[in-house]
């Protein structure tokens, strides 16, 4: 699971198409319509992901998405293992802030959270999905509302899920020693 802030932008002026060349011209100027946050969940080996935009990124927003994950996506699963970064909202306390204690406890018992190490967000596979989302859905586009963004996100994750784009992210110790020399020194005794 990961989050991504997004600026909501609209064109300051409408673009136009040249009658003589057929080329479309767009002005670089834009108007900010605020920001929002994309919450992305993924199950890498199953080739599933879902992204939803919320107007803000609060403990309650995170807790509501966790409730959706546990009750809607995995209603029959006893324990869900969630890998996420160390953001201040990504913890069990958020459930207690958002829900009544009995409901928060019910959700907390089904959730096992593993935080990636500091400066280790690359271990969070949702980062890979957010990168794909940025390149395939958000790049070089101006989306002016959370509603429009959610339409685009729904189309993106539906198409990506239908294509069964799974992530099999792994590496061997030898590869880690090559790429992360400062973390995996070779000791000579």
Report residues per predicted region.
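Short beta-strand segments
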Residues: 1, 81-84, 114-115, 170-171
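Extended, low-complexity cationic-aromatic segments
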Residues: 1-67, 180
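C-terminal domain-tail junction helix/linker
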Residues: 12, 148-189
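RNase H-like polynucleotidyl transferase catalytic core
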Residues: 25-30, 104-125, 141-143
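Short, basic/hydrophobic alpha-helical segments
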Residues: 60-81
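Acidic/histidine-rich, metal-coordinating catalytic segments
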Residues: 77-91
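Active-site proximal helix-loop segment of RNase H-like, two-metal nucleases, encompassing DDE(D)
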Residues: 118, 126-145, 159-163
């Amino acid at each position: 699971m990961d989050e991504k802030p997004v600026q909501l932008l609209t064109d300051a002026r409408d673009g136009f198409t040249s009658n003589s060349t057929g080329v479309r011209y767009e002005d670089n100027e834009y108007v900010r319509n605020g920001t929002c946050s994309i919450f992305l969940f993924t199950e890498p080996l199953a080739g599933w992901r879902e992204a939803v935009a919320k107007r803000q990124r609060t403990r309650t927003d995170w807790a509501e998405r966790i409730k959706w994950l546990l009750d809607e996506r995995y209603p029959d699963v006893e324990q869900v293992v969630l890998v996420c970064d160390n953001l201040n909202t990504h913890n069990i306390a958020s459930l207690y802030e958002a829900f009544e204690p009995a409901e928060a406890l019910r959700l907390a018992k089904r959730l096992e959270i593993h935080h990636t190490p500091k400066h280790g967000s690359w271990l969070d596979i949702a980062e890979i999905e957010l990168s794909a989302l940025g390149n395939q859905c958000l790049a070089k586009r101006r989306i002016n509302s959370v509603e429009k963004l959610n339409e685009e996100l729904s189309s993106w994750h539906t198409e990506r899920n239908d294509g069964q784009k799974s992530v099999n992210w792994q590496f061997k110790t030898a590869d880690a020693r090559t790429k992360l020399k400062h973390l995996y020194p070779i000791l000579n005794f």
